[in-house]
Amino acid sequence: MPGLKDGLKDNKKILLLSVGLLVASIVGLSFMKGSTINTNNLINTDTMQFTKPESVLEKGIDYKVVLKTSVGDITIDLFENETPDTVNSFLFLIGQRYYEGVTFHRVIKNFVIQTGDPTGTGSGGPGYTIDDEITSRKYKPYTLGMANAGPDTNGSQFFITSGNIPQSAMSNLDGNYTIFGEVVEGFAVVDSIERVTTDSNDKPANNVTVESIQILEN
């Protein structure tokens, strides 16, 4: 497992699912090494900002979303009953067209693909944070999770786990990052994004974008 395997061996590779301020000097970060995820504090950007998400989640409705990416569609079943605040925020931002045109700004083979930052830098957020909703559910391949900057700092950035993510990496995610959905269609699209060429910061050499997100209600 290139990259991740080396990091798991020598603890030198820091896997960042960044939803916070990323500057030349990363002073003040509390680093999590190996296959865990490190982020820092949210900052305001020139993108849309909100003080809190409006209440858009309706009881009794089963929600799915279709991520329409530049390389194909990914259908995700959301866990609205288990993580209502997270799903509500996600649906609110979708309704605001917040995610349209965002890139997958971090791709780590055999670990995760990450998106949800309109700035494309890993430093963007919606202007508010929501608390973690940790349940008994465990990470598995093709799981949808929230990136964070520590406990109760979820914003807009999210990730999908690799189809080949090792058990050790999943165990390190468990209990630290809210699980709020799982891929039900478009597994090959996730795989294709994971295989793109990236630079030393895990940023794809050629942009893969979320063109739009469709909400399906049942």
Predicted features by range, described:
Residues 1-218:
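Cyclophilin-like peptidyl-prolyl cis-trans isomerases
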